[in-house]
């Protein structure tokens, strides 16, 4: 019993370390609890910061499920105790004590815990996630489908009914965390997976514009890595000097035409008539 309580505490405390918030604070990214989908998880960080930050958070979240389960196995805990340790890690991720109980949805932590608990089950769940995400491009739908199948995969591969309840509880918690996604999927408002450029990628993509300015000095170069509003403003700024030159030329031409059309002012010749006396 003491080992059971110890492993539950370790799993919960490790799960409470929210890597999404830590990564965003470390690298100066927006708070994932306030921006994007407002979920401090890997998918939201992927949208806010880019692929490298999303992958970083995903790996850390998976480790939060892997490490407690491996510890439980090293301590020769019963399979049901190992399964409850995985549940504790997922609960810690969803309701972290260190971050006012506002956590993520537990998908990456669940997959990590399943990989450590039974590698084949973890691979099957991860493969299901990738398959659904690849075809439908909805992260939430992929999470719902893959985690929902996890307890049934365990029945097929392990056949131990004692581990079904904790795995089923994980599924219920993940589905509950995705309740808003359910409504958005039904209404057709759920955003699809899109990769945002990272800060490093934006800097690297901005370098061709700088080289173009060096290659053609004195010419206006419009930056192609900015949004449409700024592009329009720059295009108008380039056109304005040309428009001014055209206006001044038109004025000069008009003034010349006016001078040519004006009749020459001729003074009437006055004849002096001398009266003969």
Swiss-Prot record:
Its subcellular locations are: Cell inner membrane
Q: Transmembrane segments in this chain: where?
A: 3-23, 55-75, 79-99, 111-131, 155-175
Q: List all Basic residues biased stretches.
A: 240-253, 262-271
Kindly list the cysteine pairs connected by disulfide bridges: none
Q: Which family does it belong to?
A: Belongs to the PlsY family.
NCBIfam families for this protein = glycerol-3-phosphate 1-O-acyltransferase PlsY (TIGR00023)
Q: What is this protein called?
A: Glycerol-3-phosphate acyltransferase
| Phylogenetic classification of the source organism | Bacteria, Pseudomonadati, Pseudomonadota, Gammaproteobacteria, Legionellales
